[in-house]
Amino acid sequence: MPKGYRKTLVRQISQHAHSEIVGQLPEGNWISRAPTLERKAILLAKVQDEGGHGLYLYAAAETLGTSREQMIEALHSGKAKYSSIFNYPTLNWADVGVIGWLVDGAAIMNQVPLCRCSYGPYARAMIRICKEESFHQRQGYELMLALCRGTADQKAMAQEALDRWWWPVVMMF
């Protein structure tokens, strides 16, 4: 494998892995504040899935000869990055729905082509990740739908979250 290609793969896969791990944080803050036990279980499962996605991707990058410790050190030192969408605060419960529906939806659009990328370990990880992200996207949609069918305050909260997240999500493309 050409050295430049290997370096680019490590950079891309590690950034993707970092994004999956850091992506747990905004929604993870809401696990203890979920309005029902069912919503808590759904959110807990989603956050666990995102952690698993990060681990799949770190494992794919490790096949290229870099260690997980090196990748994490690069993140901590600022040499490596993660998706900036995860820097936006989650101010209310509706943000969890918008993240699932729109952020995960945008991620799916960007990630499905990676299922056919030229590096096998990454492509195989992406097949599983995209299937799980599709489930997360549906959960977010259903959460927003429930809010939009709720009280006037719930509808307003859903609209406010959608308005706040719209442009950051569009910037994912």
Task: Write out the residue ranges for each language-model feature.
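Helix-loop segments that flank and shape redox-cofactor active sites
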Residues: 2-5, 23-45, 106-122
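Conserved alpha-helical segments that form or flank metal/cofactor-binding pockets of metalloenzymes
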Residues: 46-74, 140-147
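Acidic/His metal-coordination segments adjacent to aromatic residues that form catalytic metal sites
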Residues: 1-14, 75-100, 117, 150-154, ...
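Internal, conserved structured core segments that host functional sites
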Residues: 84-139
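Alpha-helical scaffold segments that form or flank carboxylate-/histidine-based iron centers
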Residues: 5-16, 34-53, 96, 121-133
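His/Met- and acidic-residue-enriched segments that coordinate or traffic transition-metal cofactors
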Residues: 3, 41, 58, 109-111, ...
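A contiguous pocket-lining binding segment that forms or flanks enzyme active sites
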Residues: 121-173
